[in-house]
Amino acid sequence: VHLSGEEKGAVTALWGKVNQEEVGGEALGRLLVVYPWTQRFFDSFGDLSSASAVMGNAKVKAHGKKVLNSFSDGLKNLDNLKGAFAKLSELHCDKLHVDPENFKLLGNVLVVVLARTFGKEFTPPVQSAFQKVAAGVATALAHKYH
């Protein structure tokens, strides 16, 4: 991902304020509600029958936190996202057979949740930087599919 020094600073500063459990749980929950076909990868999570069931599901929240922990690791390796996400790409491609388009969807949902969480602090330039990072992570996760 090619970010200016200013963009890297904005991403790092805002990310330092992110509650990974809350934001991750909400982002994954919203993904499962807004794009219900993504639920097929989470059969073991129990009740996903309604928006309130999804958003209150402890397994969704826990996995959302795990997703953001990985995203956080990626932020430490912006110059080598493909390397940082190689094992996760392999897992999602070879074992889980996740449609790589879902990574883009999750990245966009994450940006929505960050905007909702941080309000005015999530300025258009900050959003632009996060969109670049989310796209870079999605590309890195899709790498093993090619």
From Swiss-Prot:
Keyword hit for Transport: yes
InterPro entries: Globin, Globin-like_sf, Globin/Proto, Hemoglobin_b, Hemoglobin_oxygen_transport
Signal sequence, renumbered to the chain: none
Sites of Phosphothreonine modification: 12
Positions of modified residues (Phosphoserine): 44
MF terms in GO: haptoglobin binding; heme binding; hemoglobin alpha binding; metal ion binding; organic acid binding; oxygen binding; oxygen carrier activity; peroxidase activity
GO cellular component assignments: blood microparticle; haptoglobin-hemoglobin complex; hemoglobin complex
PROSITE patterns in the record: GLOBIN (PS01033)
Tissue specificity as recorded in UniProt: Red blood cells.
SUBUNIT field: Heterotetramer of two alpha chains and two beta chains.
Similarity field: Belongs to the globin family.
Reported function: Involved in oxygen transport from the lung to the various peripheral tissues.
Protein name: Hemoglobin subunit beta
Lineage of origin: Eukaryota, Metazoa, Chordata, Craniata, Vertebrata
Gene that specifies this protein: HBB
